[in-house]
Each structure stands twice: as C-alpha cells, then as structure tokens.
Amino acid sequence: MRRREFLTGLGATAAVLKTGLAQTTAGAPDAVQAELDRQVATGLVAGCVCTTVGGRTWFGGRMRFDPPVPMRPDALFDLASAAKTFTAGLCALLYAEGRLDPDAPFTDYLPEHVLAQERHGITVRDLATHTGGFDNAKPYIVADPVEFNRRLYAKRPVRPRGVAYDYACSNMIYLGRIVEHITGLDLESAAIKMLWRPLGMEETYWHNIPGNARAVEAMQNGHPPIGFKGDEQARAYPAAMGNGAAFSCAADMLRFVDDLRTRRTFPKAYYDLLSTPCFEKGAVRRSFGWDMGAAHRPAGWSARTMTHGGFTGVTIGVDPGSGRAGVVLTNRLGERLAGYEGHRRLLALMSR
C-alpha cells in the first residue's frame, strides 16, 4: 500500500490503530501512549517505537502496510541522518586515542581531496559542525564507485570556513573516510569494533537488511524496498558511508544515547568532544556531530541537550545536565518539521 492509499483509509482505521495496535510494556494507557496514538491517528506517522532511560518502551501503529503488520518494539528502522552520530562517535574515539586532531586540516587525513593541494584551513571539527563552507549539493551521486569518489573529492566549499552553518551530508562522508583511513577498516567494521560492540549494540547494521522480518517499511526517500537504505547517496555507493543510513532498533539506540548520559564506557575525552558546544552563531549551537540548539530541545530539557534527527522519522537525544535520554523511531508519513515536533513532544512526555 502506498502512502496516499494509507492516508485515504486512515479515518476508517484510526479507532483500530488506537485500541488494537498501540501498546506499552506496562499495558496501560498514559500521556506518552496517548500522544503516540494521536500521531498515528492523524497520519503524522504510520507507526512508532519510543523509549527512555529505565527501559520502558511504548509502541503502536504499523510497521508495514501490504499486508498490514502491527508495529513491534524490536522493529529495525532506517536511521537516516541520525546515524551520522556514529561517524562523530568514531571520530571522538580516535581523538581520545590520540589518533585524530579535530583542529587539524581535514586534508591531513584525506589527501585525495582537491583542497589538499591548496591553503584552505577547513578542519575536521569544521566538518563535524557543518561550518567548513561546503553546501549540501551532491554532484557525486552516480552509480560508478570510482566516479562517485572522483566527484566527492573534487567538491569545493561555497563560502569561507566559520562564516555560517550549512548542513551538508558530504561533511560526514569525509569524516567517515577519515575514520577508514586511520583505522584501516571499512566504516561498518570500525563501528562494530570500536563503538557498537563495547556498548552491547548487537542489532545495528550499516548495510541493507532485505528479508529481515523486523525491518520497517520506510515511507520517505522514494519509498525504498523494505530493508534497503532510503538515502540516495547510500544507495549509490556499495559500502557504508558516514552520512548515515544505518538500521537499528530502539533498545540499541537507547544504549548509545544513555552511554552519553552516564559516561561509563569510553575515555573522558570522547564524551567531552561530543558534548561541548564548539560553534554558536544566532540560533545555531553545534557540538562535534550533534545539535545543541534550543529549537530542537524537548520541553524541560537543559541547555546541555544533544539531539540528532533522521529524515525517515527519527530523533535521538540526551541531556547530561538533567540525566535524560530518549529515542523516538517512526516511519513518518507527514511533513518533516511536524514530525520532529512530534518527536520532541514524545521525548518531553517520556522524561516527566
């Protein structure tokens, strides 16, 4: 069933979605479940799984449409850009090990780039904060990997570094390539060895998962086949890339963000790099790979809050200041910004 067909029949099925598919681990309705049910019933999302510290999980709606499959708490979602935080985390681990200098020119680690032959000043940190001057143009999206790389490394900034925040997927692709150059591992292998395994994240994947019964049907990015990455850049290249498009479940993502709250697994330098604001201008406030701006902060969370979203309908967040952390995973149907606002409402309600 396509998105339009689903929305057409939504009014007739809203009552079923509210009473038959929406559940909590406690089995009782509450404010979080009521908000989740509302988002499903109004067509903002097809389904949702959300969880917070303490392990309680809420879920409801549908994970697939034809035939309809109810959402399950261990469903695997395409994280889209929320997986950029894995790339940032790997860089932070390399920094903590003394193998990566965030304030070095990024071309020190990526000599293939055209700027390596020029005086440019763009640092690794600039890439992580999206302030190096690159825009979000994607001239490198072609089917041939060799040509993909040639165009990727030929991309030039459109403005001087540090002038403005401009979210660009290529920034994180470059950081992913830097991780691979330093470690000698492909990005997924590096994530498994350095980040996911130490955190106990056993159900997170940076490759397609066709045939997996837990894979959610994503309704964005051209409605890709179930279990396949939706991002056009990820589809164009045969290996994991730093701009995101990994698959994971709510339990694994809570392990990831909750560790940023408790700071128990990795060296102090890892947490400090990721949680310290390093670009502030106007309403923009960025740390290394994370958004710390007030506009994306759930109600009641402190100024230390770190969040990241994903186009498919995902938000992950942690507030080391108040001890909050949470994950909202949806297969979004409605408008993107309305989806993010819905995520913030759920995170605020879960943390009361």
PLM features: residue spans?
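Short, well-ordered beta-strand elements
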Residues: 315-316, 323-332
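Short, gly/Ser/Thr-rich active-site loops of penicillin-recognizing serine hydrolases
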Residues: 295-299, 335-352
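N-terminal export signals
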Residues: 5-23
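Short active-site loop at a secondary-structure junction
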Residues: 42-47, 67-126, 159-170, 241-244, ...
